[in-house]
Amino acid sequence: MVKSGKARAHTNIALIKYWGKADETYIIPMNNSLSITLDRFYTETKVTFDPDFTEDRLILNGNEVNAKEKEKIQNYMNIVRDLAGNRLHARIESENHVPTAAGLASSASAYAALAAACNEALSLNLSDTDLSRLARRGSGSASRSIFGGFAEWEKGHDDLTSYAHEINSNGWEKDLSMIFVVINNQSKKVSSRSGMSLTRDTSRFYQYWLDYVDEDLNEAKEAVKNQDFQRLGEVIEANGLRMHATNLGAQPPFTYLVQESYDAMAIVEQCRKANLPCYFTTVSYTHLTLPTICSV
């Protein structure tokens, strides 16, 4: 019997970062994180399970993916099959509505959409918490893309306890806008996965990061609760810069920031001096971008 399902999920930007995994296999982070989900950038996915299929196929933006991506999706679908208790292979058709030049990682929305589509196709009846766990197995940040608005990813200590949940802001996110500034389109010399591991294992600054990130998280959540934009902005700026500082303490040291990154940060500071309420947070995707959050 052919089974199919469709879903849409939106990408998110971490305001309080996670940097480093405690468990690489189950994607368990070293610390909790806080994100905001974006309304303009999303992934739409259709998944079809068919007894006649002999392998999993992923069609991304109209093109079949390469062998490396195919292996990754097959591994993920094995997790889905184990959960569902069947061995059907699937055809996955996915469209990313994320501008390539913006440098936004689409894995968050991609795996959140895939998890939700599989849930529908296989009638798994998963709760949002269960969906968050399942999405996390594909991409850690995907755990947060199950939810709109603000979401916190609880690090937990195993597969069962590591999941995201929504943070109630009484709709405050609708009063906020995020601007993405593309710094450059050069590929990273150090991947995020490699950078996380190197920093976790060798940086003398890493423990300092862990010591302060919970404090940052609590302050950010309190700011969201009180709709205190200035406090939220101050916390997320400091948190992002501390994350990048840990990389400079790694052996060997590395950084994702370039001169243009600092130039863009300076522009944000100049805007604040001109009474335009805005703050920056930095990301480290394939194309370095500088998201700027503004109160409107």
Residue ranges and their predicted role:
Residues L83-L88, Q270-L276:
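Short secondary-structure junctions
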Residues S109-A117:
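Short amphipathic alpha-helical face segments that pack within enzyme cores
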Residues Y279-T282:
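Short beta-strand
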Residues T286-T292:
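Conserved small/polar residues in nucleotide/adenosyl-binding loops
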